[in-house]
C-alpha cells in the first residue's frame, strides 16, 4: 500500500513546518485532524481545503472541500464545496508538487500550505499517520 508524504507549512511563517506520512485512502477529515494535531492545536473548529493558494481568494477556488459540506443536515447553507468526510487524500493530490491551502478555524484563519512531496510504501513496523519531521515551534492556537 502506498503512503503519501506531505510538507505542511504555516502560510505566514513558512519556516515552521511539519512533514506527515499518511495513507492516500485516508479522508480529508482525518488528514485535517492529523495536521492540526501536528501543530498541537485542538481540533475544535470548522476547516476546508482550497485549490486557490495565493491571496485571499481561496473561497473562490475551483476545487474546495469543507466540513460545511458534511453538515447540510444540520441546517448549514451549502457552500459549493465537496465533502471532507467522503473525499480521500488520493482524490485530491495526484502528483508530487500538488498543493492545497488548508484553512482551519474560520474566525482565527489559521492558513497552511499542504504540498505533496513524495510517495512511499507502507512499512508494517510503522503506525500511520506519522509525523516524520517537525521544524520550528508551533505558535499557540489561542492568544489568551
Residue ranges and their predicted role:
Residues 1-144:
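Short linear regulatory motifs enriched in tryptophan with gly/pro/ser
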